[in-house]
Every structure is written in C-alpha cells, then in structure tokens.
Amino acid sequence: MISFTVFVFLTLLFTLSLVKQLRKPTAEKRRLLPPGPRKLPFIGNLHQLGTLPHQSLQYLSNKHGPLMFLQLGSIPTLVVSSAEMAREIFKNHDSVFSGRPSLYAANRLGYGSTVSFAPYGEYWREMRKIMILELLSPKRVQSFEAVRFEEVKLLLQTIALSHGPVNLSELTLSLTNNIVCRIALGKRNRSGADDANKVSEMLKETQAMLGGFFPVDFFPRLGWLNKFSGLENRLEKIFREMDNFYDQVIKEHIADNSSERSGAEHEDVVDVLLRVQKDPNQAIAITDDQIKGVLVDIFVAGTDTASATIIWIMSELIRNPKAMKRAQEEVRDLVTGKEMVEEIDLSKLLYIKSVVKEVLRLHPPAPLLVPREITENCTIKGFEIPAKTRVLVNAKSIAMDPCCWENPNEFLPERFLVSPIDFKGQHFEMLPFGVGRRGCPGVNFAMPVVELALANLLFRFDWELPLGLGIQDLDMEEAIGITIHKKAHLWLKATPFCE
C-alpha cells in the first residue's frame, strides 16, 4: 500500500494546476474563522492528523482552543473539543449541524443508504423513524432478552471449559457477533462456525475500510487519486462479499413463510424490514439496497461498540484491583442462589453501572463520533462558519475537559455515584454516543449486552493477568479504526468463583 508520505507528494504534484480553481473568493477569506494551526499549501493540515486523529486533534486544541478551524485537503473543518462549545452548538444550532459529509467508503459499503451516514433530509428522517419505532423500541429490545442471556451463558461455558488464559477480545467479539446475527437474521449463524467466522471477518474488514484513508474524502475533485491509496481493490472485494451475503439473507427470509415467524415476537430485523417494505402506507418506498444499508448500520455498530467497550472495562478493572473487588462484591452480594445474573438484576448494580460510565468517558467507542457537515452559514461565539464545513466532535477531548471533570485522567467510577451525568446525549460533558438529532439511536440496543456480559464475567470468575505479567505490562495502546479497540488482545486467566 502506498505510504501517506508518497500520497502527500502526489497530491502536491497533481494539484499545482488546480490552485486557481481551488482558491477561495476574497470575501470568504475575510471571514472571522476560529483559530487553528498554520496550514501547508494544498494539503492544509492533513499532515497533522497522525495515525490516531483524536489524539492529535486534542493536542492541537489544547494549543488553539476548544473551537478550532482546520483545512483538511480542500475541506474546511471545524473541531469541537469542549463541553461548553458542544452545548453552544447542539442546543442552539443542532439542525444546522445535522448534515453528513459524503464519505467514499461509507457510501460504498452502506449502499448510500445507512442511517448513520445519510444526509439530513427526508430519507434520513423516515429511515430513522423506522429504526426507532420498529427496530430499537424498548419493547423490541426487550423481546431479545432471551437471545442475550443464552449467548452470555455460552460465553461463560466456553471460559469455564478453557485451560489456561483466554483471549477475551476474541470471545467478546464472537459474543456480540452472535447476538447481532440472531437479532438481525434470526439465527446464531447461517450454516455453522465457518459461516460465523466469515461474518466476523467481513465485519473486521468493513471496519478497516470505514476507518481507512481515501483521498477523495479530502480532495473531492481528485477522486481518481483513490487508486493510489491502495484501498480501492480491498473496498470492492469486501463490498462484493457483503453484497452476496446480504442477498442470500434476504432471499432466505422471503422464502421462509412459516407461521412460526409470522408473529411480531418472532420477527428478526430482516423480517421487520421486509414487512415495512411491503407496507403501502410508508412515506418512502424501501429498496433491497436500503435494507442492506440498515443491516450494515446494525452489524457495524452492534458488534464493534459493545465488544470494544467490554474489553476496555475489563482492562481498566485489571489495572485497578480495588475497583474490580468492589464491582465483584456488589454483584456477588446481590445475586445469590442463581447460576447467572439476569437483566432484571442490572438496575440494582449501581457501582457496575458507574464503572461502565467511567470507561465510556475514558474510552468512547468512536472518539470523533461520525463527522457532521454544516448545512448553511452560521455564527458560533462570534466566529463565522461557512456552509459545507465538516465538523469533528472530539468526544474524547470533551470527556477529559478539566473544567467539567476533577482528575479527568484518573479512573474513578465513584464520580458517577454522586453525579447525574449519563451517556445518552443529555449531558454535554460526556457524549460517547453523540448528541441531538444525529445522536446514535442504538445506545439502548448495545448497553444491555455490555452490562449483562460484564456483570456475569465478574460474578462467575476471578480475573488476573497470565503468569509472569504485572499490571504495568498491560498494553493500553489504541488501535486505528472508526471504532477504537485496544490494540493488543486482552488475555486473562479466569478462575471460577466458588461461594
């Protein structure tokens, strides 16, 4: 794959002839823009993004302020890095900030039809309404309680039968993948372990492409430069594999007209979408490609977010033995005489819920959220922001804001025992799942998986690092991607707990 340095050189070379066309008019130059770092000709501030952009942008924002203006290639970009600025924008200008930029990999892999990346407009409104009312309603999420319980039980059995340390990263990804497969497709997998592994591999490659660097996202007039990025062929390959998979899933569901699946309580996600597709009263006609786009939303968000969060939680608890002990004592004191923690127990596990919140603060799944785009000119704190500006909300930086958090770099779950701050988009100090119209509608889908799995892992086992490793050896480095995973897999020794 061509290196980023070579790409920058090629960009400089090929854009020389387009300088005049890319220059902004004089009137726009006179705009009072937010402060930002000096930019290079042609590439702007692209060279300052680094391999983990949320970290680089946090560093730059510490120097230039919580509202920062960058030029990423030919794309004007606003970076929001404090709770105060997030509150100003999303309380007073949410509709203006609800657009989405056109991103190459997301458009291709999502059939231009995902709810997450759809432009702000009628299609997005109608599909989001369908998702909230039909797929993510409290009643629908509750209907899958048995699926979550059964899959967590299988996870516990796998761990109990293991000899030696277990790769918790792989096990939790398999857990969330199986849960989403059953909820979305009606089956744990379509034909066995090999097929489940295939789905898992497709999702990993999809995540890699969504987090990949495609030149056209920063130089829209130079789309042909994508061929030099080294990702184009990989993107097309995974798209074909996914498309064939989703085609087969839809065909199987259309062919399956058994009475067992006719009741709403037996419907999976594909059943619901096919039913809605046939409804003549729908405001928009839904195509098969749009059904596939919704499935991409559910698979990508439903598997990666939950599994990454569970691993960050277990990693932080290993690093903080007192917190681990308190969490285990809480769940073991509450749940007695039962083999497993059930979802009805979760509301009483206040400390464990605080642990989850603290980890979402320190390790938001998508630290820059999904990029937004301003739909019209607007003024923020006296700064004039032009339409079509891309917006990056640095949720990680906001959650580390010392104006809002005491000792923000420390792992302190206790802070949430006395604080009403939550992660559902109502508090601007913490936005791991976004805020406003474009906030993630699937948070209530993912969190029962995280909490049920975590509570049972702590209830059933004592955990420690493999022999010979100390807390100081636990690698907490982040991996590159649209969802931030722990780079090194988490291997732990599990000892069954005996009351």
From Swiss-Prot:
Q: Name one GO cellular component term.
A: membrane
Keyword DNA repair among UniProt keywords: no
Residues holding heme: C440
Q: Which GO molecular function terms does the record list? A: heme binding; iron ion binding; monooxygenase activity; oxidoreductase activity, acting on paired donors, with incorporation or reduction of molecular oxygen
Query: Sorted alphabetically, which Pfam families does this protein's record hold?
Result: p450
Cofactor dependence is on:
heme
Question: What membrane topology was assigned to this protein in its record?
Answer: Single-pass membrane protein
Segments traversing the membrane: 2-22
Instruction: Give the EC number(s) listed in the UniProt record.
Output: 1.14.-.-
InterPro entries per the UniProt record, alphabetical: Cyt_P450 (IPR001128), Cyt_P450_CS (IPR017972), Cyt_P450_E_grp-I (IPR002401), Cyt_P450_sf (IPR036396)
Q: What does its record list under induction? A: By fungal elicitor.
Query: What keyword terms does UniProt attach to this protein?
Result: Heme, Iron, Membrane, Metal-binding, Monooxygenase, Oxidoreductase, Transmembrane, Transmembrane helix
Chief localization = membrane
| Compartment list | Membrane
Stated family = Belongs to the cytochrome P450 family.
Q: What is this protein called?
A: Cytochrome P450 71A9
Gene source species: Glycine max (Soybean)
Q: What is the lineage of its organism?
A: Eukaryota, Viridiplantae, Streptophyta, Embryophyta, Tracheophyta
Gene that this sequence comes from: CYP71A9
